Amino acid sequence: MARDEVRRILPADIKREVLIKDEKAETNPKWGFPPERRPMEMHMQFGIINLDKPPGPTSHEVVAWIKKLFNLSKAGHGGTLDPKVSGVLPVALERATRVVQALLPAGKEYVALMHLHGDIPEDKILAVMKEFQGEIIQRPPLRSAVKRRLRTRKVYYIEVLEIEGRDVLFRVGVEAGTYIRSLIHHIGLALGVGAHMAELRRTRSGPFKEDETLVTLHDLVDYYHFWKEDGIEEYFRKAIQPMEKAVEHLPKVWIRDSAVAAVTHGADLAVPGIVKLHKGIKKGDLVAIMTLKDELVALGKAMMTSGEMLQRSKGIAVDVDKVFMPRDWYPRMW
């Protein structure tokens, strides 16, 4: 049976059109700190690491180790990986810690090795695995920390990479909270022979991939020492991504300079503050509020659609939830 070409598309890959509300708006270069202009200490305070987690330690242990190494007060990870699982683990630092929430709607990708408990023809394996694309129902595994309620999760794609005897290597793109161990168990049941997960590696978490930004714990130790001991910051800077990377996939609203301080002081975003926005925003969507220099100001919930934000002259457009930008980056205008 011929293997179909698989389109590997996650929600994070959706391209969005930008709508302009005010063509004349400009930003003052004296204010703010765009990612490329942040001093090293600040870059770390508002940074996120695309870490290649090794098999062995828990995700929490890895984060605790990074906190201790860099002498941080806060850090958090996006999407727990079991101890035996390796791969992409975004670790957000200090002021950026809560940005990991933005990764939830982005989708994740894994490469898994499934071991079947009986011999099955290749064409049947391919046909049955294809059936698991789309909405599936899962109950978290017994060892999970989550309550074991039935819930639906989306499988965006399954691509079989190699079949050798009873071993099936495949790539799968899924919604956050999908248990690959459970998915493999159910594929085994559908094939009538049973199956278990032999190995698992996460290859993607939204915008974070197995690319040149992926760093190991050993890399981090070396780069940190180059910076602290030798004053060479180039490698450590590259190892830490700006927090804005974690919201690349989110629908965005860009605001004028005069609206920034109000949002950083706790105000919700009103329509007059908007300069441009992404098309397709729906009420209730998680949106990123950005400056015209592409600095992340805050995350919030859309209270209007894109069309309403574009057409209206007043009203609350975004209910601000988490503010990331310090209050002193832009001056108060009220």
From Swiss-Prot:
InterPro entries: Dyskerin-like, PsdUridine_synth_cat_dom_sf, PsdUridine_synth_N, PUA, PUA-like_sf, PUA_sf, tRNA_PsdUridine_synth_B_fam, TruB_arch
Catalytic reaction equation(s): uridine(55) in tRNA = pseudouridine(55) in tRNA
TM helices/strands, residue ranges: none
One BP term from GO: snRNA pseudouridine synthesis
Gene Ontology molecular functions: RNA binding; tRNA pseudouridine(55) synthase activity
Signal peptide: none
Gene3D superfamilies, sorted: Pseudouridine synthase, PUA domain
The entry's keywords: Isomerase, tRNA processing
Pfam families associated with the record: DKCLD, PUA, TruB_C_2, TruB_N
Record-listed E.C. numbers: 5.4.99.25
Domain of life of the native organism: Archaea
Residues in PUA domain copies: 250-325
Family: Belongs to the pseudouridine synthase TruB family. Type 2 subfamily.
Protein's job: Could be responsible for synthesis of pseudouridine from uracil-55 in the psi GC loop of transfer RNAs.
Protein name per Swiss-Prot or TrEMBL: Probable tRNA pseudouridine synthase B
Organism placement in taxonomy: Archaea, Methanobacteriati, Methanobacteriota, Thermococci, Thermococcales
